[in-house]
Amino acid sequence: MAFLTIAPGAFAQAPAPASLSAEDKALVDKAVSYLQGLTEARGRFTQTDARGATSQGELFLKRPGKARFAYDPPSGLLVVSDGGAVAIQDTRLKTFDSYPLMATPLSLFLARTIRLDRGVQVTRVSRAADGFTITARDGKKQTAGQITLTFADNPMTLRGWSVTDAQGRTTQVRIDGLERVSGLDPGLFVLKDPRPKNVGRGKL
């Protein structure tokens, strides 16, 4: 999967959750409060896959549930979450796939109510000079997922995330210039299946 390894079951096994200190918990609460208040935003993203290949594009967020990742040419990739499903269209490869939002890492910060103490297990909180990271897994599934969210301090900003798949390959997404906006076009978060009804899944 080209984008963020979002296919169901794509997560690697995560370590057992660590005991969080009071300072760790305060940072988790700070991150949750920030994400909960991030209702509409746009910015640029750079994705780096396990082979080191990079691609860029424009990101739109409209919480709860909605996101759009429009990749720059020559990539033909477009990823859209409409609140219930994440659709992935590749016009170059002529493919179209769809997954339940709740089966993807995006659900961690697109949920209506973000909870990192229910159904999600925080395994690590790490500090840096200009921010911090939170590593978490989905505690609801038999296959534990692992995603690391990166935040900057002063001002508080989501910098990006990384996901490791079942083969131990990591895909990283860095966000630049994320800004709060309002009135995003609802059409940004609609991606209809272009395939004729008699065409099998994945092929246009």
Segments predicted by a language model, with ranges:
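Bacterial N-terminal signal peptides
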Residues: M1-A7
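Flexible, surface-exposed loop/linker segments and immediately adjacent secondary-structure boundaries
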Residues: L93-K140
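An acidic-aromatic
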Residues: A14, E58-L108, T171, G177
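Extracytoplasmic
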Residues: L38-E40, T54-Q56, K62-K66, P73-P74, ...
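Gly/Pro-enriched, hydrophobic low-complexity segments
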Residues: D117-G119, R127-L204
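Boundary at the C-terminal end of the N-terminal hydrophobic targeting segment
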Residues: A10-A18
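Solvent-exposed strand-loop boundary residues in beta-sheet-rich modules
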Residues: D49-R51, R92, Q167
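A short, Trp-centered hydrophobic/proline-enriched beta-strand micro-motif
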Residues: S33-A50
